[in-house]
Amino acid sequence: MDCCTESACSKPDDDILDIPLDDPGANAAAAKIQASFRGHMARKKIKSGECGRKGPGPGGPGGAGGARGGAGGGPSGD
């Protein structure tokens, strides 16, 4: 059974909603959705890159550099 031959798969143009593009609420919602998706893709990319590593990476236990634990300008915690 081919989905493309059925009339249920195709939407008529009447069902498409007309959304005003200058609506501030819609723009804010779109920005949040885009930021969420970009964060998801970044986490997915980082996760796939770390799966192939063995041992601690930079910034991890015994590693050097990174935002934590490196030689930075933050408080020393003494």
Swiss-Prot record:
User: One GO CC term of this entry?
Assistant: trans-Golgi network transport vesicle membrane
> What tissue specificity does the UniProt entry give?
Highly enriched in brain with restricted expression in neuronal subsets primarily in the cortex, striatum, and hippocampus as well as certain nuclei within the thalamus, hypothalamus and olfactory bulb. Accumulates postsynaptically in dendritic spines of neostriatal neurons.
Which residues are in the Collagen-like domain?
48-78
* Domain of life (superkingdom): Eukaryota
In this UniProt entry, the residues modified to Citrulline are R68
Q: Which residues carry this modification: Omega-N-methylarginine?
A: R68
* One GO biological process term: positive regulation of long-term synaptic potentiation
Q: Which residues carry this modification: N-acetylmethionine?
A: M1
The record's similarity note reads:
Belongs to the neurogranin family.
Q: What is known of its domains?
A: Neurogranin is intrinsically unstructured; however, upon binding with CaM, The IQ domain adopts a helical conformation.
Which protein are we looking at? Neurogranin
Origin organism is Rattus norvegicus
* Record lineage: Eukaryota, Metazoa, Chordata, Craniata, Vertebrata
